[in-house]
């Protein structure tokens, strides 16, 4: 399993920017591309990374991945 740097950057931006729309704006890519990147990571890791809803929250797996993604 290979986690792509672009996927990790998108995931990190979602957390740092507080949502998918703002992450897309910060990365100058579509919101769909950000969603697909995070979904790709979730598929590869076989676990959800964020709890979607009114507030965006990291899951335990998401917290561990975010620590790694900060280095990318």
For each predicted feature, which ranges?
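The N-cap/first-turn positions of alpha helices
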Residues: 4-7, 31, 62, 69
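Short alpha-helical "packing" element that flanks the helix-turn-helix/winged-helix DNA-binding module
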Residues: 10-14, 65
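Residues in the recognition helix of alpha-helical DNA-binding motifs
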Residues: 37
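A short LG(V/I)-centered, amphipathic sequence patch enriched
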Residues: 42-58
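Alpha-helical linker/hinge and terminal dimerization helices associated
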Residues: 44-45, 65-72
